[in-house]
Regions:
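A short acidic, Gly/Pro-enriched loop at the edge of an enzyme's catalytic core
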Residues: 30, 34-44
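Short alpha-helix
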Residues: 87-110
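Class I SAM-dependent methyltransferase SAM/SAH-binding core
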Residues: 1-33
Length: 130
């Protein structure tokens, strides 16, 4: 499978530079004026520890019908355990599943305390796009 990696710091992905099946894009989605992979279809999208509400729809749109979305990030209540503490970066209860439910079949959803690797309040969803 071809894989596209997108992060604001791609230094940990340097070993993928010569891999013909890997595309590495450096972009800070919190400050970017546009969604850098908009319009490109993906059979699977994985998002971890990231929330930028104004592009959440773009992320979901990037998944092809029949494709898989795996999304996990921090939720309200995480302030007790560490960063992020700013509500701008914390999902409200049920926010992720409400956003995804319209166009995806939900395979699994969790909201609560994750203990490993470190305590945090998270929301995560696995869903297939209709």
């Amino acid at each position: 499978h071809r894989v596209t990696f997108l992060d604001r710091d791609v230094s940990a992905l340097a070993d993928l530079h010569n891999n013909p099946k890997a595309a590495v894009l450096c972009s800070d989605l919190e400050t970017s004026a546009h969604f850098p992979i908009g319009g490109q279809p993906f059979d699977g999208v994985v998002v971890t520890n990231f929330l930028q509400r104004d592009i959440l729809g773009d992320i979901c749109d990037a998944v092809t019908p029949g494709g898989l979305l795996l999304y996990e990030t921090f939720g309200t209540g995480n302030e007790t355990y560490g960063r992020p503490r700013n509500s701008k970066f914390l999902l409200k209860p049920g926010e992720l599943i409400k956003t995804v439910r319209a166009n995806f079949d939900i395979l699994g959803f969790e909201h609560g305390l994750r203990r490993i690797p470190s305590p945090a309040i998270i929301q995560r969803v696995a869903a297939v796009k209709r």
